[in-house]
Amino acid sequence: MQQTFEQISVVVQGPVQNYQGRTHHEEGITQRCLESIRTHLPGAKIILSTWPDQDLAGLDYDQLVISQDPGVNLVDGLPQFPKNYNRQLVSTQAGLAQVTTPYAIKLRSDNYLIGNEFVAIQHSFLKSESEHKVFEEKIVINSNLFRRTSHGRSVLMSPSDFFYFGRTANLIKFGNSHYSWIILLPNMLFRSCSRLPNRAIH
């Protein structure tokens, strides 16, 4: 009997396919992303959260969320790196706001799944009973670009932005905390980012 995942919604966020300056990705990357969800998370709801005027032809999703593009990050009128942080926050939060299932995944539209082991991993951890806990349950985040250092210096609050899985309410709280941090400390963003060829999530 095939396992189903009706308790999970997947928010696929970002521009779709090889859109404008996004030609460094493989052709049809968003279609591959959506197909991987159908394959590895049968029964899960797919929410595509993107921008106006995207080419949605041939894309398999259950719900579409369109947000106005906030543009690149600016500090004192100058573009900052990573330049699309505000875009990622807006599309992620808009998608999560539509989730009605207890669990959710945030997945970039240029990444894809190659398995569903992360569900069992998340469920294998006991709920934290600590008085200092932030979330009801653990959030699973992939390790690619989960930074401990940048340019030889230790950095804080620098998780990867490819993939999150956990309780929907916890992901919303996590996203809101990121929003507060980016507003308060815009100049503390790390300044370099490695390009990784492998964008698959196990």
Predicted regions mapped to residue ranges:
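Hydrophobic targeting segments
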Residues: 6-12, 37, 45-48
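Active-site-proximal specificity loops/subdomain of glycosyltransferases
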Residues: 48-98
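Short aromatic/hydrophobic "clamp" motif used to bind/position activated sugar donors
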Residues: 104
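Active-site acidic Asp-centered loop
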Residues: 107-108
